[in-house]
Amino acid sequence: MGDGGAERDRGPKRREEPGGRSGCRGEHRGAEDLRADTGSTSPREIAGTSASSPAGSRESGGDSDGQQALGETDHCRRILVRDAKGTIREIVLPKGLDLDRPKRTRTSFTAEQLYRLEMEFQRCQYVVGRERTELARQLNLSETQVKVWFQNRRTKQKKDQSRDLEKRASSSAFEAFATSNVLRLLEQGRLLSVPRAPSLLALSPGLPGLTAGHRGTSLGDPRNSSQRLNPMPSASASSPLPPPLPAVCFSAAPLLDLPASYKLGSSAFEPYSRLEQQKVGSPGQSDKKADI
């Protein structure tokens, strides 16, 4: 009896063992099939699909639930990537063009609002606190819109001021350059227009007290000059000569009247002057001899 009961107890166990073994084999086969199916795909794509699909929320746990709670928009795609250190990072990529993404609408101000904002900016460039709240209420705008408008207006004013300073600096530099060029040209013109010494022919007709004979002596041969110089002592005795004129320049000095006692020291006029002196002195000597 005991042996029969023991055999009965062993029977179901033996029957269960093949079933249990078959169940384990089925699980191993399912894992192998899954590996074969996923062998062609990369682990990045598997992670991406698990993060983007709702079924992957069970594996990721509370983190994926929080991401789904934040809301995954239609224009973004999230991918989980494991780097070389083993940490998993999330990358957000756009699904389509950036133009498809919804953008913030720009605030369009009316002419009245712009006029009022400009007047307030001219009065005070920084509007804060109650003033900004009251201005936003009067213009039917939000405080953020008023704040952003004032920020943009201050930035524009700074740009305009810097541009004006650059223009003034460039204009002043140009004026200084032009002035230096004009001064340089004037200096060059003054140096080039230095008056030259007047020539002898230009000064000879304008000098008073010069006769044609004197001009002939200055320009003629020495013989004529010796004959023309003879009447000088008699003329000086009868009427006094006018005082000599000051020399205009060094080139006009030979044209002045020479006094009677002046003796020419040049070798060309010496023989003629000696002959004339002997002729003039001979009548006086004869008179002295007669008196004796």
UniProtKB/Swiss-Prot annotation:
The keyword Hydrolase does not apply. InterPro entries: EMX-VAX-Noto_Homeobox_TFs (IPR050877), HD (IPR001356), HD_metazoa (IPR020479), Homeobox_CS (IPR017970), Homeodomain-like_sf (IPR009057), HTH_motif (IPR000047). CDD domains: homeodomain. Residues 1-74, 212-241 are annotated as: Disordered. Its main location: nucleus. Residues 1-36 have a biased composition (Basic and acidic residues). It is found in: Nucleus. One of its GO terms (cellular component) is cytoplasm. It comes from the Eukaryota. Gene3D superfamilies: Homeodomain-like (1.10.10.60). Pfam families: Homeodomain. Residues 38-55 have a biased composition (Polar residues). Keywords: Developmental protein, DNA-binding, Homeobox, Nucleus, Transcription, Transcription regulation, Wnt signaling pathway. GO terms for biological process: axonogenesis; brain development; camera-type eye development; central nervous system development; dorsal/ventral axis specification; embryonic eye morphogenesis; forebrain development; negative regulation of transcription by RNA polymerase II. GO terms for molecular function: chromatin DNA binding; DNA-binding transcription factor activity, RNA polymerase II-specific; DNA-binding transcription repressor activity, RNA polymerase II-specific; RNA polymerase II cis-regulatory region sequence-specific DNA binding; RNA polymerase II intronic transcription regulatory region sequence-specific DNA binding; sequence-specific double-stranded DNA binding. Disulfide bonds: none annotated. PANTHER family: HOMEOBOX PROTEIN EMX-RELATED, VENTRAL ANTERIOR HOMEOBOX 2. Belongs to the EMX homeobox family. Transcription factor that may function in dorsoventral specification of the forebrain. Regulates the expression of Wnt signaling antagonists including the expression of a truncated TCF7L2 isoform that cannot bind CTNNB1 and acts therefore as a potent dominant-negative Wnt antagonist. Plays a crucial role in eye development and, in particular, in the specification of the ventral optic vesicle. May be a regulator of axial polarization in the retina. This is Ventral anterior homeobox 2. It comes from Rattus norvegicus.
